[in-house]
């Protein structure tokens, strides 16, 4: 239901509990000639930022994420790196477009193999007939556990892992960087558009970080402008 307030007051907001429900609701707004829909997400609800749902995103971070500037910058920079993962080739996008379940490998002869993986938590992978995996497509989440399992196997040396979008990547920076250093690559079927990064230097416990230092350090780390919206008022 959509409503307009007749007077000042307090409201209790609720909304769709899934991305599918959210997309349906957004489509229903066409009849109201709505030009802009703003989705309120969180770092713990990254799926809302999927390019399948939103056209672009603003990354809001701050002292609530970490009260240490160095740690906060490192964590945020990694999130930005994931958002900016390269789009995979058009050939791969066409090849995997209609696959919605499982994990699939493409060998050096461009033949596809169903690895019979039912979950990203599984360590049982069917590698029969595969000498080297050129491309690995994951329809679900890419987790630390799965990455730990495959990166030690020669068949996955210098493999490109393709996921639907950045919200499907649940890797720690250490594992991600180790995979890339080994010649691996992670790319996406749908690329997100990051249009701004904002910070709130005030933590929930009242601790306040140096806003100027935070914005400057983070901007240098991610090579993007960073805004403290409170100072922009």
What are the residue ranges of the model-derived segments?
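Flexible phosphate-sensing "switch/lid" loops adjacent to ATP/NTP-binding sites
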Residues: 1-233
């Amino acid at each position: 239901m959509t409503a307009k307030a007749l007077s000042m007051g307090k409201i209790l907001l609720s909304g769709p509990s899934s991305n599918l429900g959210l997309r349906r609701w957004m489509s229903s707004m066409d009849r109201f000639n709505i030009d802009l829909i703003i989705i309120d997400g969180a770092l713990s609800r990254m799926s809302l930022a999927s390019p399948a749902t939103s056209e672009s995103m603003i990354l809001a971070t701050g002292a609530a994420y970490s009260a240490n500037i160095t740690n906060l910058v490192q964590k945020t920079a990694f999130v930005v790196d994931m958002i900016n993962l390269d789009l995979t080739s058009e050939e791969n996008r066409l090849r995997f477009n209609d696959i919605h379940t499982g994990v699939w490998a493409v060998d050096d002869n461009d033949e596809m193999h169903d690895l019979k993986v039912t979950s990203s938590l599984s360590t049982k992978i069917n590698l029969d007939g595969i000498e080297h995996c050129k491309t690995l497509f994951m329809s679900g989440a890419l987790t630390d556990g799965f990455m730990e399992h495959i990166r030690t196997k020669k068949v996955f040396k210098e493999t490109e892992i393709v996921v639907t979008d950045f919200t499907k990547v649940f890797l720690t920076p250490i594992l991600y960087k180790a995979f890339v250093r080994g010649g691996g690559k992670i790319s996406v079927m749908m690329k997100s558009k990051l249009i701004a990064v904002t910070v709130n230097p005030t933590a929930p416990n009242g601790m306040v970080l140096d806003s100027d230092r935070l914005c400057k350090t983070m901007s240098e780390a991610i090579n993007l402008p960073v805004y403290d919206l409170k100072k922009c008022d």
